[in-house]
A protein has these predicted regions:
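Conserved sequence signature across two-component system core domains
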Residues: 7-8, 34, 52
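CheY-like receiver
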Residues: 41-100
Length: 100
């Protein structure tokens, strides 16, 4: 069973992605959801998700900041950003922390 953490402040986006993942891989996934970056870090500390899929623009702690905190705890988890942001500074920071 793979533990997946979805972090996005838009509930409809989280629900749509969770639904697609469960439809395709439901028998091998356990999905948790966070509504902001701070909550994502807290859930990660509790559940140690192997795959984290998150938005960049979120309240309290943005996705890149949350990913940096998670990466400092776990060098091996997979971090993927799903975002409409096109600002290169976010992409550079994502590359530094080995996120996709």
């Amino acid at each position: 069973m793979y533990r997946v953490l979805l972090a996005d402040d838009e509930q409809i986006e989280r629900m749509a992605l969770a639904r697609r993942l469960m439809r395709r891989f439901g028998d091998i996934l356990q999905i948790s959801e966070a509504t902001n970056g701070k909550e994502a870090v807290q859930l990660y500390e509790k559940e140690h998700s192997q795959i984290i899929i998150m938005d960049i623009s979120m309240p309290e702690l943005n996705g890149v900041e949350a990913a940096e905190k998670i990466r400092s705890m776990d060098e091996d988890c997979i971090i993927v950003f799903l975002t409409a942001y096109d600002e290169f500074s976010y992409a550079k920071r994502a590359i530094v922390i080995r996120a996709l």
